[in-house]
């Protein structure tokens, strides 16, 4: 079995000049795909997004494991209301840093790698052993991908 502990952090920005619905949907799809991958490998997956459900409820799942968790996670992802204002992603990252674990892999997914988010990711990298930044982009479009980040082509 795969004994990883993974935390997916997904930025769903709904209130900025960066907002494009297809990009936000790509970020949600990337989170779903990665969760599916890790859960099928047997990892324990936690998930947090700054997106909100139609009830304004924060979307957080802790320590999911097993194939059945994929359905629960996808249900929550499908509940993200892109018409609702999202919380500040950089602040969300900073809030988890005091409780971050060295043994956990953190995967941050954002369509807008702006300074405050990159600073928060860098701070998380200084506290956690493994942090991966993924930037979804539409194939053929020029997007500035920060050094060390991975592009997720859609």
Residues covered by each model-derived region:
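Exposed, interaction-prone extracellular/peripheral surfaces
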Residues: 1-154
């Amino acid at each position: 079995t795969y004994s990883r502990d993974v935390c997916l952090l997904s930025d769903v920005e709904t209130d900025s000049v960066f907002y494009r619905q297809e990009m936000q949907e790509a970020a949600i799809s990337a989170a779903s795909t990665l969760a599916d991958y890790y859960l099928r490998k047997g990892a324990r997956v936690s998930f947090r997004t700054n997106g909100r459900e139609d009830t304004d409820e924060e979307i957080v799942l802790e320590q999911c494991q097993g194939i059945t968790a994929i359905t629960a996670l996808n249900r929550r992802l499908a509940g993200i209301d892109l018409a609702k204002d999202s919380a500040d992603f950089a602040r969300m990252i900073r809030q988890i840093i005091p409780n971050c674990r060295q043994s956990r892999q953190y995967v941050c997914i954002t369509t807008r790698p702006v300074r405050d988010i990159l600073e928060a990711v860098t701070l998380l990298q200084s506290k956690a052993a493994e942090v991966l930044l993924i930037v979804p982009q539409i194939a053929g479009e020029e997007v500035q991908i920060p050094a060390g980040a991975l592009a997720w082509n859609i």
